[in-house]
Amino acid sequence: MPPLDTIAAVATAVAPGQGGIAVIRLSGPVAEQVAQAVVQCPGHQEWGSHRILYGHVMAVDGQRRLDEVLLLLMRAPRSFTGEDVVEIHCHGGVMAVQQVLERVLEHPGVRRALPGEFSQRAVLNGRLDLTQAEAVSELVSARSRRAADLAMAGLDGGIQARITVLRERLLDQLTELEARVDFEDDLPPLDGTALLNELQAVRVELLALVADGERGDALRHGLRVALVGRPNVGKSSLLNRLSRRERAIVTELPGTTRDLLESEIVLDGVPITLMDTAGIRATNDAVEQLGIARSEEALISADVVVLIVDGHAGWTETDAQLLARIPNDVPRVVVANKSDLDGPPLPGLVDVQFSALNGAGEDAFVQVLLERCGAGDAAGIVLSLNTRQRDLASVAAAALERSHEVAQQQLPWDFWTIDLREAIRGLGEITGEELTEAVLERVFSRFCIGK
């Protein structure tokens, strides 16, 4: 049953100040009626689906023009949601957008859309499967080209196709088992070994998808990398080298960085937030102490910590103390900076030598950095399951493992089907074949309004 109400929201980002264009999106049974009531289109323009019309949004009194707009009507089912959809393209200033949206919402039967409600209706109306809807959100939030590529692979149906094939393979095996439960005397013996091999093959593919998804998280969400070290070892110089701009003040005065500086970069397709921390040392300066406290917090929150030492001065007791302060569960990379200068021998725990001055060792540093946080081969990933999808794939894989254990115990066929059904149900929940209110709430509550 189609929704009885029509929803409306701003579908484009509206930042404070002025913008070029904004889009007000409507979807539902009275969307076209609202457009005809709100927008006055002069001349002999032909009103029809998938046509651009020119006009003005008029105030309720029909006398005052609120904005000059373009109007696009897309009648069901040829629209994003599968319902009648209207897009009003207005000017992007905050007041212009606010006035147009408020005018639309004044019409009976129209309400503000909930987060992700347009995409949710697209799923309920069969325009998208659940993985494609999630890919829309991921494409909007992509922070790198590779993240956008992965999102497009999902939007093109790559995840849905892969999961559907695996689910159908399990359904084939379930059909064989259920036939034996009901009509075993009328059918030839079942090849239990072949069945188990098929279940194991599906399980292996699921675990591979889970592993790729975990690596793909680095592409989707990025990594937070804390640069720590004694004062004046070159943390800020390293940050500036990698970000290719003078983000941090670089001087010969120890303790110059007194706060936590951040720089957004992309390394081999992975979005990286570099956190240039204050040099950790004993000091009586209250401001510097605050920066050092934030540096300590960065050690805990980072996905990987880069300890920078002065290769020219050599390894010191302070370097060893800093290394010991990095939490054991946080990956770390030890970098000896100033490789362009002569220095004493360095201990074997130094991972790479680097020169922030001329860039020597930069490629090696990037490779080690990405490998330490599990993103070393992320650039080669074709499909990447998100957290929800990975959780369900893991549940399915665990159920298939239990099926194998049941087989080893030589239990009757109907015992095999219990875990097999759970695996099938989990895969169906990934794509939306198994859809519940709880699943819809979990997925779409994280979306932006207007998507």
Curated annotation (Swiss-Prot):
Domain of life: Bacteria
Enzyme class: hydrolase
Key words of the record: Cytoplasm, GTP-binding, Hydrolase, Magnesium, Metal-binding, Nucleotide-binding, Potassium, tRNA processing
Alphabetical GO biological process terms: tRNA methylation; tRNA wobble uridine modification
Residues bound to (6S)-5-formyl-5,6,7,8-tetrahydrofolate: R25, E87, R127, K451
Signal peptide: none
GO molecular function term, any single one: GTPase activity
Coiled coil regions, renumbered to chain: none
Localization annotation: Cytoplasm
Binding site for K(+): N232, T251, L253, T256
Domain TrmE-type G: start-end pairs: 222-374
Entry binding sites for Mg(2+): S236, T257
Gene3D superfamilies the record matches: P-loop containing nucleotide triphosphate hydrolases (3.40.50.300), Probable tRNA modification gtpase trme, domain 1 (3.30.1360.120), tRNA modification GTPase MnmE domain 2 (1.20.120.430)
Alphabetical list of InterPro entries matching this protein: G_TrmE (IPR031168), GTP-bd (IPR006073), GTP-bd_TrmE_N (IPR018948), GTPase_MnmE (IPR004520), MnmE_dom2 (IPR027368), MnmE_helical (IPR025867), P-loop_NTPase (IPR027417), Small_GTP-bd (IPR005225)
Subunit text: Homodimer. Heterotetramer of two MnmE and two MnmG subunits.
The protein's role, per its UniProt record: Exhibits a very high intrinsic GTPase hydrolysis rate. Involved in the addition of a carboxymethylaminomethyl (cmnm) group at the wobble position (U34) of certain tRNAs, forming tRNA-cmnm(5)s(2)U34.
Protein family (similarity comment): Belongs to the TRAFAC class TrmE-Era-EngA-EngB-Septin-like GTPase superfamily. TrmE GTPase family.
Protein's name in the database: tRNA modification GTPase MnmE
Originating species: Synechococcus sp. (strain CC9902)
